Amino acid sequence: MNNGINVNSEIGKLKSVLLHRPGAEVENITPDTMKQLLFDDIPYLKIAQKEHDFFAQTLRDNGAETVYIENLATEVFEKSSETKEEFLSHLLHEAGYRPGRTYDGLTEYLTSMSTKDMVEKIYAGVRKNELDIKRTALSDMAGSDAENYFYLNPLPNAYFTRDPQASMGVGMTINKMTFPARQPESLITEYVMANHPRFKDTPIWRDRNHTTRIEGGDELILNKTTVAIGVSERTSSKTIQNLAKELFANPLSTFDTVLAVEIPHNHAMMHLDTVFTMINHDQFTVFPGIMDGAGNINVFILRPGKDDEVEIEHLTDLKAALKKVLNLSELDLIECGAGDPIAAPREQWNDGSNTLAIAPGEIVTYDRNYVTVELLKEHGIKVHEILSSELGRGRGGARCMSQPLWREDL
């Protein structure tokens, strides 16, 4: 396997993919913290792990190397104690701590562990009852900080490895995530990308040190020259235009077109890939609820303009826009839930539109969305069904749970 990144489509044969196996962080969700941690329910960890292992084995059985972000982080921090210390300092600063009693106590506690255990603990979260730290500040005794059981909050969304970063061509975006609950995830990515030999010299199109937000579920690689990005609850239009400029200007980038698709800004449709995915050269899944009653949706084609500016063309027909940027005479939009007014929103809620292509016309998706699965098969798609009862409680499907590192070029 070649090192680095090579993702020039959504559908090229999947050869290497980044995952995170759900761990103790999932059991550190409570009914009181679900909203803050972006969950609607609490998965049963034992079954979620079995389901995730089945998902990973499905990918391996079909020729993909599975790489775990927690293992990459462990390798980086084991190699350099200086990098480990720098990371911990960065992590604690972003969590709001400064040198002093709590900061020093957390540093001592985390560095006393093996590196593997430290990484697992960072994902799981550090409870206040794990450390004997004298509480002297009022904020430790009253208010929201005092009510929090954790010094470092758990990262239960981490099994959705799509979002903290996005492989794009030969490079990657490391993302400024929208909500604090997920921001440490892309900090881990930042240190892995900067220090792991696997990614030496990999270009970073955009790092996480921005004020505007973007998440990988909104970033779709349509082909070697075109990316689609959702204007969504989690990704801003300003970010998209800035990223387009960066891609157009960088000589290592092959991208000259960005298709911005505006979708409803709500939790059920948090990213573009929850309502729209590419599954073949000319076939896509789509949730019809992203369009108005007349079938219209705001779509914008961004291309290089004069004086390093970006030219923007506005359309309201998704199918026409896709045909234009992909140079296709026809394409097949396959509706989630067969477009049924009950089945479509039900199956979209359970990630029926969130499919992972592992080759052209061959996908992995949840078994529970049987209306969509049967329709996909009728349209000639080869479907690998994976278990979903617990993983799906996190509101993400097969694409959400995976970050391709290497795909064969088409």
Swiss-Prot record:
Keywords: Arginine metabolism, Cytoplasm, Hydrolase. The active site is at C400 (amidino-cysteine intermediate). Its EC number is 3.5.3.6. It comes from the Bacteria. GO terms for cellular component: cytoplasm. Signal peptide: none annotated. InterPro entries: Arg_deiminase. Belongs to the arginine deiminase family. NCBIfam families: arcA, PRK01388.1. This is Arginine deiminase. It comes from Lactococcus lactis subsp. lactis (strain IL1403).
